[in-house]
UniProtKB/Swiss-Prot annotation:
Known partners and oligomeric status: F-type ATPases have 2 components, CF(1) - the catalytic core - and CF(0) - the membrane proton channel. CF(1) has five subunits: alpha(3), beta(3), gamma(1), delta(1), epsilon(1). CF(0) has three main subunits: a, b and c.
CDD domains, per database record: F1-ATPase_delta (cd12152)
Protein name: ATP synthase epsilon chain
Topology of this chain in the membrane: Peripheral membrane protein
Organism, scientific name: Helicobacter hepaticus (strain ATCC 51449 / 3B1)
Known role: Produces ATP from ADP in the presence of a proton gradient across the membrane.
Keywords linked to the UniProt accession: ATP synthesis, Cell inner membrane, Cell membrane, CF(1), Hydrogen ion transport, Ion transport, Membrane, Transport
SUPFAM superfamilies in alphabetical order: Epsilon subunit of F1F0-ATP synthase N-terminal domain (SSF51344)
Gene Ontology terms, MF aspect: ATP binding; proton-transporting ATP synthase activity, rotational mechanism
Protein family according to the UniProt entry: Belongs to the ATPase epsilon chain family.
Length: 131
C-alpha cells in the first residue's frame, strides 16, 4: 500500500514532516479524510485538529487555528497560521501541549461550542500519546 507524505508548517517552522497512512483535516466546509490516491485538492482550513496515523500505527494530533491544505495522490501539504502538536514523552509534556493548544484555539474562535468540541476531543485522546 502506498503512503502519504504529510507536511505541516507554520511561519515559525515545521510542526510535522513524515510518512503517514491517512490524514483527517478540518476543512472550511467540514472535516475530510485523505488516503493515498486522493484527487488533487486545495482547501481552506478552519480551527480544529489534524489527525493522522504514522507508519508505526501511532496516532498524532495537531491543533491549528486556520490555514490551507494542498493535497495530491501522494502528498498533503498544510500551511497553518498557528499550530501545536499534541505530543510528548511524558504526561506533563502532553498536558503542557494541550494547554498550549487550548490557548491557540481559544484565541482563534469566538464559537464556544466549536472550542468545547475540539478541546474535548484533544483531552479525551491525550493518554494515547504517552509513550
Amino acid at each position: 500500500m502506498e503512503n502519504l507524505t504529510l507536511s505541516i508548517v507554520t511561519p515559525y517552522g515545521s510542526i510535522y514532516n513524515g510518512e503517514v497512512k491517512y490524514v483527517v483535516i478540518p476543512g472550511s466546509e467540514g472535516e475530510f479524510g485523505v488516503f493515498p490516491g486522493h484527487c488533487n485538492l486545495l482547501s481552506l482550513l478552519k480551527v480544529g485538529v489534524i489527525e493522522f496515523e504514522n507508519l508505526e500505527g501511532n496516532k498524532g494530533l495537531v491543533a491549528i487555528n486556520w490555514g490551507h491544505a494542498q493535497i495530491s495522490d501522494t502528498d498533503v501539504n498544510i500551511i497553518a497560521d498557528g499550530a501545536v502538536a499534541i505530543a510528548g514523552n511524558t504526561e506533563s509534556e502532553i498536558v503542557a501541549a494541550i494547554s498550549d493548544a487550548k490557548t491557540l484555539l481559544k484565541e482563534a474562535s469566538d464559537d464556544s461550542a466549536l472550542f468545547g468540541m475540539v478541546v474535548s476531543r484533544v483531552e479525551s485522546d491525550y493518554k494515547n500519546f504517552i509513550k
